[in-house]
């Protein structure tokens, strides 16, 4: 397990998607704003919580010494910058009580913390993660293609809908259903809504590719490395469901402009995984904190140029679609 978790970090950093759907979106500049820059409000609300900023550090790793080091750095960045931090899957800690790679809040009592577990795990496992870490919410990831590509992956999936229903009915804490970079299709989102899910992270293609990661770990199905739908495509497809469920976006988010574009397409907030992993691997924690704080100002700047005072107002921004993204909307 330790080697697998470390492989995930190594190969996630290696991968570069050949296409990012956010490059096919052009936002329409507004020349005469109604607001001062200081009036721009970055706050948002999802999963029953208010957050000061519309982006967060999404689930990545844990379960190894390397994972612990990464989590400590990310937690320090999140705590200092006032961002939400979601740990990687807690399943390894359930198997190993001595695993402390997720225990990042003990020295940071004010950290905005959430944790993650796979949908292959029953409700009781998620409940144990909640009891151990006391998170703001539980993120439940759905990773079908990754499981199929892993030699040691799951092969029985009939229980997944029951697990999801159990979380929706029994968990006395908000939870989010999260894809892992393959894009959550509209039918799956609707099924989740029918089962009682209130918030989903559609996590599309364009960032971390677990197909690539598992193929680098020894698989021979590299033709599936680009499996799934891109983040922007999923957001566009999910427009009819925006009033029925809270939608978060992740997958291929590189910088503040990508964050804004995802918010324009209806996301309540935006998660970053690989980008944050790369930052803490290439820079000191203090340098990353400075970069992230700079992003906050960049978001305000872009919102001012779009004449938007709040995150909700971004939904009214005009935009143009190009290339693959535009072609996808014609079908």
From Swiss-Prot:
Known catalysed reaction(s)? isopentenyl diphosphate = dimethylallyl diphosphate
Its subcellular locations are: Cytoplasm
Residue numbers binding Mg(2+): 147
Q: What superkingdom heads the lineage? A: Bacteria
Say if the entry is tagged with keyword Isomerase.
yes
Which keywords does UniProt give here? Answer: Cytoplasm, Flavoprotein, FMN, Isomerase, Isoprene biosynthesis, Magnesium, Metal-binding, NADP
Pfam families (UniProt xref)? FMN_dh
Is DNA-binding among the key words of this record? no
Q: Which residues bind FMN?
A: 59-61, 89, 116, 178, 203, 208, 252-254, 273-274
InterPro entries in the record? Aldolase_TIM, FMN-dep_DH, IPdP_isomerase
Q: Which residues bind substrate?
A: 4-5, 146
Molecular function terms in GO for this entry?
Answer: FMN binding; isopentenyl-diphosphate delta-isomerase activity; magnesium ion binding; NADPH binding; oxidoreductase activity
| Top-level EC class as recorded in UniProt | isomerase
Q: Which GO terms describe its cellular component?
A: cytoplasm
Instruction: Give the record's GO biological process terms.
Output: isoprenoid biosynthetic process
Q: Per the entry, which co-factors are needed?
A: FMN; NADPH; Mg(2+)
Q: What is its EC number?
A: 5.3.3.2
Principal location class = cytoplasm
State the family named in the UniProt similarity comment for this chain: Belongs to the IPP isomerase type 2 family.
Checking NCBIfam families in the record gives: IPP_isom_2
Q: Self-association or partners: how does it assemble?
A: Homooctamer. Dimer of tetramers.
Q: What does this protein do?
A: Involved in the biosynthesis of isoprenoids. Catalyzes the 1,3-allylic rearrangement of the homoallylic substrate isopentenyl (IPP) to its allylic isomer, dimethylallyl diphosphate (DMAPP).
Q: What is this protein called?
A: Isopentenyl-diphosphate delta-isomerase
Organism, by scientific name, is: Streptococcus mutans serotype c (strain ATCC 700610 / UA159)
